[in-house]
């Protein structure tokens, strides 16, 4: 779908479908009044009959109104006079998109300037959410279906903006388009079956991306290099699988050579059986999504590349497959990490932190401004926060605050959890420097505490996306593309874009 921005009068546009808002109690804003006047009171007449109550997201399609060049006019309810929240705004836009998809029109014009959104400016903030909602709603994953989705008639959507705000709306569309590209790439990787999407496949994806972008350097560390670097924890996770582990390094130089990079670290467990600590069979198919941390880093990089942000960014994807076999890691094994610290592996299903801890140590060599790791790390995070918000922890209040703010602005929220010293005690082991689990209490926090022991050399934050990375079961099952909006917003803010 192509999104364009224009500054013209709604009543004069020629289009298959013109979309205008109508408030409750037959309230017409400036746009609706102008269209009503041009159509000789057709809008008012419909409202007087009570055909549309004007509640947020309600729609009514009108055909061939006199005095207009638009073939159809779609009225959408905008509610009472107060501003809509982010959720209501997104639902309204999705409602409009749903109607437009069912029509045979190749284009549509949205004249929604009269709708206010809480805590969003009238141009960039409001239209960024609108554009992301439209573009993300276009996503279809039918690669393995013998019968593909029908091509959609709607090819172009024009957003009408006032002249003063047109440039900001265009900037919003540009950013939203890049984020949507990144989210779609993330969702594609997450939705792929694990027999195809394994560590070596992700390495090939990285190489292909490097070939397509001159400013991107790609290095793939194989299992021998991982072992030679002393990454005993990382190596242990993949040793039970026929698919060897890979540490994928993508280095984007968009800033000055002297600028310290931001580092994103993604957990890339392409399939997680739990290893010897085997997971229950029910729902195990969804463990292909255990690489969504790495996928979201990939997607964020895609957005950064599209926008050519003036920053330096290093992406580290810690990829392995966690399988049981005669050569797999056992509960009770002790491994030495790249940092020199030893870990007693009490549960092989707590494997994500093992690939991440060595990767966090590896990140030190880049002398980063900040390091953010993203992982579908703990089921405990789903229990604590559900699927609406990602868990967030860190060792630097400014960094955590910047990420929380980015989440609010991108409508991709996170919630901070503590890393108090008392939780560290739960990781004590009688045989090694630490165990890889901290008991049944505060599982998300103790996982963060574990990682914090390997991130003392820099400002660091950890995002647990176990509840937000994919939707379980039902017709909407699949990867969500989160937290690409949050991460991209954070980098946009750092770049001043």
UniProtKB/Swiss-Prot annotation:
The keyword Ribonucleoprotein does not apply. GO terms for biological process: proteolysis. CDD domains: Peptidase_M17 (cd00433). It is found in: Cytoplasm. GO terms for molecular function: manganese ion binding; metalloaminopeptidase activity. Mn(2+) 2 binds at residues 267, 272, 290, 351. It is an enzyme of class 3 (hydrolase). GO terms for cellular component: cytoplasm. Its EC number is 3.4.11.1, 3.4.11.10. Belongs to the peptidase M17 family. This is Probable cytosol aminopeptidase. It comes from Pseudomonas putida (strain GB-1). The gene is pepA.
């Amino acid at each position: 779908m192509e999104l364009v921005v224009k500054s013209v009068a709604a009543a004069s546009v020629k289009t298959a479908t013109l979309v205008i808002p109508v408030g409750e109690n037959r309230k017409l804003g400036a746009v609706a009044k102008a269209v009503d006047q041009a159509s000789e009171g057709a809008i008012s007449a419909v409202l007087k009959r009570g055909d549309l109550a004007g509640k947020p997201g309600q729609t009514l399609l009108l055909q061939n109104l006199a005095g207009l060049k638009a073939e159809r006019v779609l009225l959408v309810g905008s509610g009472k006079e107060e501003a809509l929240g982010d959720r209501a705004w997104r639902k309204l836009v999705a409602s409009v998109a749903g109607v437009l998809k069912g029509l045979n029109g190749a284009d549509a014009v949205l004249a929604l300037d009269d709708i206010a959104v809480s805590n969003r400016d009238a141009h960039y903030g409001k239209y960024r959410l609108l554009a992301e909602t439209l573009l993300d709603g276009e996503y279809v994953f039918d690669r393995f279906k013998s019968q593909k989705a029908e091509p959609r008639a709607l090819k172009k959507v024009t957003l009408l903006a006032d002249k003063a705000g047109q440039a900001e709306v265009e900037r919003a569309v540009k950013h939203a388009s890049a984020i949507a590209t990144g989210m779609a790439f993330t969702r594609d990787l997450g939705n792929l079956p694990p027999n195809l999407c394994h560590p070596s496949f992700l390495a090939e994806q990285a190489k292909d991306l490097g070939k397509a972008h001159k400013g991107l350097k790609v290095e793939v560390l194989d299992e021998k290099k991982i072992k030679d670097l002393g990454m005993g924890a990382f190596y242990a996770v993949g040793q039970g699988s026929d698919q060897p582990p890979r540490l994928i390094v993508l280095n984007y130089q968009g800033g000055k050579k002297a600028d310290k990079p931001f580092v994103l670290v993604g957990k890339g467990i392409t399939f997680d059986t739990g290893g010897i600590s085997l997971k229950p069979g029910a729902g195990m198919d969804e463990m292909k999504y255990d690489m969504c941390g790495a996928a979201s880093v990939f997607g964020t990089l895609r957005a950064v590349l599209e926008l050519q942000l003036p920053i330096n960014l290093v992406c580290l994807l810690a990829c392995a497959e966690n399988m049981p076999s005669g050569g797999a890691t056992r509960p009770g094994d002790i491994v030495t990490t790249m940092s020199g610290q030893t870990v007693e592996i009490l549960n092989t299903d707590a494997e994500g932190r093992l690939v991440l801890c060595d990767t966090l140590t590896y990140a030190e060599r880049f002398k980063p401004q900040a390091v953010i790791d993203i992982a579908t790390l703990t089921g405990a995070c789903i229990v604590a926060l559900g699927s609406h918000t990602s868990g967030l922890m860190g060792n630097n209040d400014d960094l955590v605050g910047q990420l929380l703010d980015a989440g609010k602005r991108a409508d991709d929220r996170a919630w901070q959890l503590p890393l108090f010293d008392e939780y560290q005690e739960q990781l004590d082991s009688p045989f090694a420097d630490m165990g890889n689990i901290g008991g049944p209490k505060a599982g998300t926090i103790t996982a963060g505490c574990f990682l914090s022991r390997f991130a003392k050399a820099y400002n660091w934050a950890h995002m647990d996306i176990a509840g937000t990375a994919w939707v379980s079961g039902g017709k909407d099952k699949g990867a969500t593309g989160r937290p690409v909006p949050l991460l991209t917003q954070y980098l946009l803010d750092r770049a001043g874009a």
